[in-house]
From Swiss-Prot:
Tissue-by-tissue expression: Corpuscles of Stannius.
Family assignment from sequence similarity: Belongs to the stanniocalcin family.
Descriptive protein name: Stanniocalcin
Purpose of the protein: Its primary function is the prevention of hypercalcemia. Upon release into the circulation, it lowers calcium transport by the gills, thereby reducing its rate of influx from the environment into the extracellular compartment. STC also stimulates phosphate reabsorption by renal proximal tubules. The consequence of this action is increased levels of plasma phosphate, which combines with excess calcium and promotes its disposal into bone and scales.
Signal sequence extent: 1-17
Ranges for region Disordered: 228-250
InterPro entries: Stanniocalcin (IPR004978)
Pro-peptide positions on chain: 18-32
Quaternary state and interactors: Homodimer; disulfide-linked.
Length: 250
């Protein structure tokens, strides 16, 4: 019933590459904007239109590694015609909600990169939840699958936030997103993930001990990802990387 192994491995590149321990000290060069950057970014956001992607273009021009939202915005606008009426409204209102949220909080967080990046992700997730992303995805699975494509700058935290929000949806919607991701991977990687997807779920997943959100839906764990993938015991190759057994008594 659970088909999590392929989905988890499809998303590992998204989350594992950018997650940072908040307690990790940041160097002055990477932790803060240059002397003129805070006012430039804030002025750009305050002068940007409340519709469209102009506000997110301001984030691409920062020196705090906040790229990603602009590309997500353009993907939504490019695919808006494929959504139904509810979906079109969601595209318009979600982009406006995120842009307004970021603009209203920019002065509180912009001087420290980690705070600024986290604020953008939180606003993004709040707007998706408020405007019922899952309901839109359920009625527009193909259109949403096209929007949730691997971005040119990969990985990035805002693309991951979009995927994590979609993972709280029903199983059919999650499968649609997963299939769309795999279809856009390089052929070799796509084959690898398809093969790994056919493996049985780890005992912990089968026993229902994996991370479960409200209403029984699966949710991507926010801590460091851990994977326990085992091949079929009868066909185990003792020399294979994945065939190494965990020592229990020796």
């Amino acid at each position: 019933m659970l088909r999590m192994s392929g989905l988890i491995l499809t998303l590992v590149l998204v989350t594992a590459a950018y997650e940072q321990d908040e307690s990790e000290p940041l160097s002055p060069r990477t932790a803060r904007f240059s002397a003129s950057s805070p006012s430039d970014v804030a002025r750009c956001l305050n002068g940007a239109l409340q519709v469209g992607c102009s506000a997110f273009a301001c984030l691409d021009n920062s020196t705090c590694n906040t790229d990603g939202m602009h590309e997500i915005c353009r993907s939504f606008l490019h695919g808006a015609a494929k959504f139904d009426t509810q979906g079109k409204t969601f595209v318009k209102e979600s982009l406006k909600c995120i842009a307004n949220g970021i603009t209203s909080k920019v002065f509180l967080t912009i001087r420290r990169c980690s705070s600024f990046q986290k604020m953008i992700s939180e606003v993004q997730e709040e707007c998706y939840s408020k405007l019922d992303l899952c309901s839109v995805a359920q009625s527009n699975p193909e259109a949403m699958g096209e929007v949730a494509q691997v971005p040119s700058q990969f990985p990035n935290r805002y693309y991951s936030t979009l995927l994590q929000s979609l993972l709280t949806c029903d199983e059919d919607t999650v499968e649609q997103v997963r299939a769309g991701l795999v279809s856009r991977l390089e052929p070799e990687m796509g084959v690898l993930f398809q093969l790994l997807q056919t493996k049985a779920c780890p005992p912990s997943a089968a026993g229902g001990t994996g991370p479960v959100g409200a209403g029984g839906s699966w949710r991507w764990p926010m801590g460091p990802p851990m994977f326990k993938i085992q091949p079929n015991l009868r066909s185990r190759d003792p020399t294979h990387l994945f065939a190494k057994k965990r020592s229990t008594s020796s």
